[in-house]
Regions:
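Long insertion/accessory domains within large nucleic-acid-processing enzymes
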Residues: 254, 259-262, 394, 439, ...
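Canonical P-loop GTPase G-domain recognition
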Residues: 120, 130-190
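Short glycine/threonine-rich beta-strand-turn micro-motifs
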Residues: 164, 347-362
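Helix N-cap motif at beta-to-alpha junctions
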Residues: 225-227, 277-278, 357-363, 405-409, ...
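Interdomain boundary/hinge elements
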Residues: 36-41, 149-161, 195-205, 241-254, ...
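Conserved nucleotide-binding/hydrolysis modules and their immediate coupling elements
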Residues: 203-306, 314-318, 480, 489-539, ...
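A short, contiguous, amphipathic alpha-helix enriched in charged residues
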Residues: 313-336, 549, 553
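P-loop NTPase switch module centered on the Walker A-proximal segment
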Residues: 1-97, 101-103, 137, 141, ...
Length: 598
């Protein structure tokens, strides 16, 4: 029997989780020194750009004759579905905290789940090489956090390791620098329990899946008890208790970054099974004769929905490869296989789908991925999902933490209370304050841009879903109207220049626009239809000095999330591989007026 340790790594965005795993792989001689510029784990472009881990990866290293399976978890609560299933594979966890920032709200979300399952934590205080960091205070903050999350006595007695993953050292005392990260690996062997070796009929809970064009879907999970062998007949039990008989074609275990084919897998190890059919995440693989299912994973309910529809704008099909409803339908179905917290509902009459997810980030990552693959689609404004609880209409409430310089704190509090938020606590940390609120999810849509503008870009904002509470009343939305293009054509600098006192533009001169496209923000509340395609009429009469150059303020450029949060109820965001345009749902001006009158 090989010795095994299964650990999950929990950390806030950008505290260095993926870097730490890279260094552990270096210690296990998986990577050569020269490969260590790029982060090996964040392997899709989106993750590298945003510095967030969306999908969990599995890696295993050998150390002192023990196999350590490292499971990288997504830190953001929008990916709640991912987090929970991943933690089910681990026996212990490493909580990674920044020596300056301390534990953040999203760390709290994952940590709470880990403590509930009963994982034993090791705390790593990272980035102690940074100036003005405060490792000892952070250590106390972690203790208080665990205490407030109802950790057991045993969990509270956690070992602490200090170090800098980037500079490749870890030590039990932050003042004594070492040369490598072995203190951390030793702590893992010492403090994290080995998986229990349970004899009996085999059981394995499927916690994630992979897809290969050759073998189809591959089930990944941790063998709970017994031994799985290649070629064995098994029973698959799904959530509803229905059974189906199948055969294991191939078994793979994780080794390094890849997988290795094997004949048998013992309890406690993590493996991948090829050859199963029609399984879902949360199903159990069990014995052929007397199947006993494990309890399925509870997954967080979605809290937001968005309308996806085919692109029907005048520029339809110019930039994307996949534009028809059949393409979008297939792509969404494929996403449902992997993305646990997602739900999709097709509109029977039109080519439209309502997609439910955990938050704006969760949905925007899907849209961004589709866009890069060459899809064209339109999305509506994000809507919050309401629930009836005991006959009362309830809405999702989130816990929001904002960290800003003290001068801006009153502005923040004012802005959030106007969005029906209630302030829970406020503590000063040097020149900055940390403020906590409970805010309806509706109030968070579109909040980030305003918070950053009001605090001159200094605010750090994080939020996570808390619970459903009774409806809090109406919230004021964006009050400015839109400037809408009157006719299709090329936008001219001359026209834009003459209209600048009417509001701010989103387009550059010489950009193609179509009638009904939103080209700017009006300074007043009503929508304004303008003609940006007017060019200057040329005559050969010239008075000296009357010819002014057009001077144009640079346009506002939106990121995908900002655009989603910006659009109104009667607008769509058109997303194509090359551009994003906001538009009115009804493009024709007369029809829009008619619809508004009714």
């Amino acid at each position: 029997m090989q010795k095994i340790r299964n650990i999950a790594i929990i950390a806030h965005v950008d505290h260095g989780k993926t870097t730490l795993v890279d260094k552990m792989m270096l210690a296990g001689n998986l990577l050569k020194e020269q490969d260590n510029d790029n982060l090996t784990l964040d392997n899709n472009d989106l993750e590298r750009e945003r510095g967030i881990t969306i999908l969990s990866k599995n890696v295993s290293i050998q150390y002192k004759g023990t196999k350590i399976n490292i499971i990288d978890t997504p830190g953001h609560s929008d990916f709640g579905g991912e987090v929970e299933r991943v933690l089910n594979m681990a026996d212990g966890c490493i909580l990674l905290v920044d020596a300056f920032e301390g534990p953040m709200p999203q760390t709290r979300f994952v940590l709470q789940k880990a403590l509930q399952i009963g994982l034993k934590p090791i705390v790593v205080v990272n980035k102690v090489d940074k100036p003005n960091c405060r490792p000892d205070e952070v250590h106390e903050m972690v203790f208080d956090l665990m205490f407030s999350l109802d950790a057991t006595e045993e969990q509270l007695d956690f070992p602490v390791i200090f170090g800098s993953a980037k500079n490749n050292w870890m030590s039990t005392d932050w003042r004594k620098q070492t040369n490598d990260i072995t203190p951390l690996l030793d702590a893992i062997l010492e403090h994290i329990p080995a998986p229990e070796h349970l004899e009996g009929t085999p059981q394995m809970l499927i916690t994630s899946l992979d897809y290969s064009p050759y073998t189809g879907r591959i089930a990944i999970g941790r063998v709970h008890r017994g031994t799985l062998t290649e070629g064995a007949n098994i029973t698959l039990v799904n959530r509803n208790g229905e059974q189906s008989k199948m055969k294991i074609k191939e078994l793979h275990t994780f080794e390094g970054l890849g997988r290795k084919k094997t004949d048998a897998v013992n309890s406690g190890d993590i493996c991948a099974i090829v050859g199963l059919d029609k399984f879902e995440i949360g199903d159990t693989v069990c014995d052929f004769e007397n199947p006993e299912a494990l309890p399925p994973i509870a997954i967080d309910e979605p809290t937001m929905s968005m309308l996806f529809t085919i692109n029907d704008s005048p520029f339809f099909g110019k930039e994307g490869k996949f534009v028809t409803s059949r393409h979008i339908q297939e792509r969404l179905e494929k996403e449902l296989d992997k993305n646990l917290a997602l739900r999709v509902k097709k509109d029977p009459e039109e080519d439209a789908w309502t997609v439910f997810g955990r938050g704006v980030l969760h949905l925007s990552v899907l849209i961004e991925t589709m866009r890069r693959e060459g899809y064209e689609l339109q999305v509506g404004q994000p809507q919050v999902i309401y629930k009836e609880i005991d006959g009362v209409r309830c809405e999702p409430i989130e816990e929001l933490t904002i960290n800003v310089p003290t001068d801006y704190s009153s502005k923040m509090i004012d802005m959030i209370t106007r969005r029906k938020g209630e302030m829970l606590s406020m503590e000063a940390q040097g020149e900055r304050v940390n403020i906590e609120f409970n805010v309806p999810s509706r109030g968070i849509i579109g909040l980030r841009t305003n918070v950053l503008t009001a605090s001159a870009g200094e605010a750090i904002m994080a939020h996570r879903f808390k619970e459903y509470q009774p409806y809090k009343g109406d919230i004021e939305r964006r009050t400015n109207g839109s400037m809408v293009a009157m006719e299709s054509g090329t936008a001219f600098a001359y026209a834009i220049d003459k209209l600048q006192d009417r509001g701010r533009f989103f387009i550059n001169p010489q950009e193609e626009v179509y009638a009904g496209q939103v080209v700017g923000e009006h300074i007043h509340e009503n929508d304004l239809v303008i003609n940006v395609t007017k060019s200057k009429k040329l005559t050969n009469m010239r008075a000296s000095g009357s010819d002014d150059k057009a001077r144009i303020v640079p346009p506002i450029i939106f990121s995908l999330e900002e655009a989603l949060e910006y659009i109104k109820e009667d607008e769509y965001l058109e997303v194509t591989p090359k551009s994003m345009r906001m538009r009115k749902i009804i493009l024709d001006e007369l029809e829009r007026k008619r619809a508004n009158k009714q």
